[in-house]
Amino acid sequence: MSELATLSQNKIIDRLKKSLDATYDVPPSNDDKPMRQAAVLVPFVEVDGEWSLLFIQRSEHENDCHSGQVAFAGGRYEESDEDMFATALRETHEEIGVLPEDVTVLGQLNHHYSISNYQITPVVATMPWPYDLTLEEAEVAATFTIPLRWLTDTTNYRVEERILNGKSLPVVYFEPYDGYVLWGATARMTLSLIDLMSTNP
């Protein structure tokens, strides 16, 4: 799947037009609580002539279940947001300083679900690189890129089954990359993207 690292932007757009179920996703919560909406930006950036994805590492906070985790920039939908694309762009600007006008939205993946009762819309885009990022330190400790060529190598990740509330759920773990460990919902979104990009339109 190394050809994914050099796909043209038009081919990425074409492949995003297809409908493909989320990969290794957890089912939506079936309790009575209304599901909360969130969106993340999945940014393709060009590094040394090949695509990489831009990730963040969350800042450490006591009693925060997402503290220190690797993620895509993003967050909760707000009523002032026109749509979920706007949510992803606003949150990315707030968290790492990327201007919305510098982002080219290509499409989106199907919804993913988190164990914290969120329905997440992954918005796929490109942006210039390198970029002068400004981190909101209360939320973001670091940013880094991982080459798509590395992410598509099946020797770099594994899927395990975990029992939560009596249900067997898949948990995806990538091998550490420069000390960063990609797992959980962000890892599932990454695999969904790879699966979608790997099928011809």
What is the meaning of each model-derived region?
Residues M1-A71, R76-E94, V98-Y131, R149, ...:
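N-terminal leader/linker segments that precede catalytic domains of diphosphate-processing enzymes
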Residues T155, V159-I163:
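Acidic, negatively charged sequence signal
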Residues E137, T155, I194:
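Short, flexible helix/strand-to-coil boundary loops that buttress conserved ligand/catalytic motifs
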Residues L133-W150:
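Acidic, glycine-rich loop-and-strand cores that form catalytic or ligand-binding grooves
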